[in-house]
Curated annotation (Swiss-Prot):
Organism, scientific name: Yersinia pestis
Name assigned to this protein: 2,3-bisphosphoglycerate-independent phosphoglycerate mutase
Active site: 64 (phosphoserine intermediate)
Function noted in UniProt: Catalyzes the interconversion of 2-phosphoglycerate and 3-phosphoglycerate.
Molecular function as annotated in GO: manganese ion binding; phosphoglycerate mutase activity
Pfam families: iPGM_N, Metalloenzyme
SUPFAM superfamilies reported in the protein's UniProt record: 2,3-Bisphosphoglycerate-independent phosphoglycerate mutase, substrate-binding domain, Alkaline phosphatase-like
Membrane-traversing stretches: none
A GO CC term assigned to this protein in UniProt: cytosol
Length: 515
């Protein structure tokens, strides 16, 4: 049948970095006969997935959002972190019209300025330097009640590393003589992205009503009490910070709320609980009518609140270019990485392109993925293999979340099991691609599972790495690999393998040359 398509499949193994040392390396120590043979026998190279190569500051570890934006754009996309660092350094942040108007409004009406966000130097969802700049902006413009609601990390940072950040902000508020840390809570609750509304409700009640399971006189004492209960930063239970005699810092009508996370995927849910009139994820005991709610960057097109830094639009991303050339494409992943192969890969475009189908596989409902390291990979592989053999698609883009999601738990044995599960999946994908006479690229968006312990601290290493990632070609063409690539070279590589023109906006270079 002449209309049967021979697909080009891009398989992204999330968190699957390349590291030569075996110590604490869940990828190298796992039994991976399939990937081993592919690496030995197929054209392959290593590509950069962090720092300046993906538009992040030099040395900054890569992450899934940044990785997928670069994969889909075919050019280095300067990330919000880099953009905001530059704005603060050059002083423009302090005159941002959206932020200054929101603070001025609170000052004029005698209301509080609430600042919330992930208090972390991780630089993945936020950066504490940006939060510090926001505190300074509010104080400079005359805000007299400044409340910081700190979401704690321990995922993109070491599991117990929040104390220095809390001390830094406590000292800043003391220096200003104004404002305080009003609450602390782990990101597990405040930044869920998987519709676990019971978690989000705990964060919402803490923020709106100053209602939490625990109370402490100061943030460091609250954190130390959480550690004594066995909670790492990520899992710190809702804790109200309020010294004897202090008024509570609940959010009230007319207050200003500024959300300082710059990454969208884990900011959306809690934002919707504040701003959606029809929100029904849980019963909100208190609905606050804010004077201003500001999101630092755009979390979703349908969230209709002011945005301090709207997105710069990307034209002729890989998905859009396929649409313009009447090609069909499929995006497929589990819940945890679905936004990455759709919204982020498409350069921040929410709606599918014409000819773009999407398949969402539900991630398992477990507390943490070390409890089910295989996640939903069996169902994902079954659907992927079926799509490869369907003859419907020119291109299929798939993300397997296991390496990253299990890597984040810090559980080495579970990460090994996750990697071994992936090897079995890849075997099935390779067979399906060969049967369809298609082409397959296997890569990753960033590293994680190859470094499961921090050699400096001895703690579990739950964060991403700055290491390179593999790129392997399997298919019906004789190709030669080019060295020195990066994630933004993948889209031009794919267009080249499809013998399509590469748009001028894509500055990446093909990494496999047809011989």
């Amino acid at each position: 049948m002449s209309s049967t398509k021979k697909p080009l499949v891009l398989t992204i193994l999330d968190g699957y970095g390349h590291r030569e040392e075996q110590q604490d390396n869940a990828i190298l120590n796992a039994k991976t006969p399939v990937m081993d043979v592919l690496w030995q026998q197929q054209p392959h190279t290593l590509i950069a997935a962090s720092g300046l190569d993906v538009g992040l500051p030099d040395g900054q570890m890569g992450n899934s959002e940044v990785g997928h934006v670069n994969l889909g754009a075919g050019r280095i996309v300067y990330q919000d972190l880099t953009r905001l660092d530059k704005e603060i350094k050059e002083g423009d942040f302090f005159t941002n019209p959206t932020l200054t108007a929101a603070v001025d409004n609170a000052v004029k009406t005698g209301k509080a300025v609430h600042i919330m966000g992930l208090l972390s130097a991780g630089g993945v969802h936020s950066h504490e330097d940006h939060i510090m700049a926001m505190v300074e902006l509010a104080a400079k413009r005359g805000a007299t009640a400044i409340y910081l609601h700190a979401f704690l990390d321990g995922r993109d940072t070491p599991p117990r590393s929040a104390e220095s950040s809390l001390k830094r902000f406590t000292a800043k508020f003391a220096e200003l003589g104004n404002g305080r840390i009003a609450s602390i809570i782990g990101r597990y609750y405040a930044m869920d992205r998987d519709n676990r509304w019971d978690r989000v409700q705990l964060a919402y009640d803490l923020l709106t009503q100053a209602k939490g399971e625990f109370t402490a006189d100061n943030a460091v004492a609250g954190l130390q009490a959480a550690y004594a209960r066995g909670e790492n930063d990520e899992f710190v239970k809702p804790t109200v910070i309020q010294a004897t005699g202090e008024a509570d810092a609940a959010m009230n009508e007319g207050d200003t709320l500024i959300f300082m996370n710059f990454r969208a995927d884990r900011a959306r849910q809690i934002t919707r609980t504040f701003v959606n009139a029809e929100f029904d994820g849980f019963k909100r005991d208190k609905v606050v009518n804010f004077g201003d709610f500001i999101m630092l960057t755009e979390y979703a097109a349908d969230i209709k609140v002011a945005c301090a830094y709207p997105p710069a639009s990307l034209t002729n991303t890989f998905g859009e270019w396929l649409m313009k050339h009447d090609k069909t494409q499929l995006r497929i992943s589990e819940t945890e990485k679905y936004a990455h192969v759709t919204f982020f890969y498409n350069g921040g475009v929410e709606e599918p392109f014409k000819g773009e189908d999407r398949i969402l596989i539900n991630s398992p409902k477990v507390a943490t993925y070390d409890l089910q390291p295989e996640m939903s990979s069996a169902e994902l592989t079954e659907k992927l293999v079926s799509a490869i053999g369907s003859g419907k698609y020119d291109v299929i883009i798939c993300n397997y979340p296991n390496g990253d999601m299990v890597g984040h738990t810090g559980d080495y044995d579970a990460a090994v099991k996750a990697v071994e599960t992936l090897d079995n999946c890849i075997e099935q994908v390779v067979a399906a691609v060969k049967a369809a006479d298609g082409q397959l690229l296997i890569t990753a968006d960033h590293g994680n599972a190859e470094q499961m312990r921090d050699p400096a601290t001895g703690q579990a290493h739950t964060a991403h790495t700055s290491l390179p990632v593999p790129l392997i070609y399997v298919g019906n063409k004789a190709v030669k690999a080019v060295e020195g690539g990066k994630l933004s070279d993948i889209a031009p590589t794919m267009l080249s393998l499809m013998e399509m023109e590469i748009p001028q906006e894509m500055t990446g270079k093909p990494l496999f040359i047809v011989e």
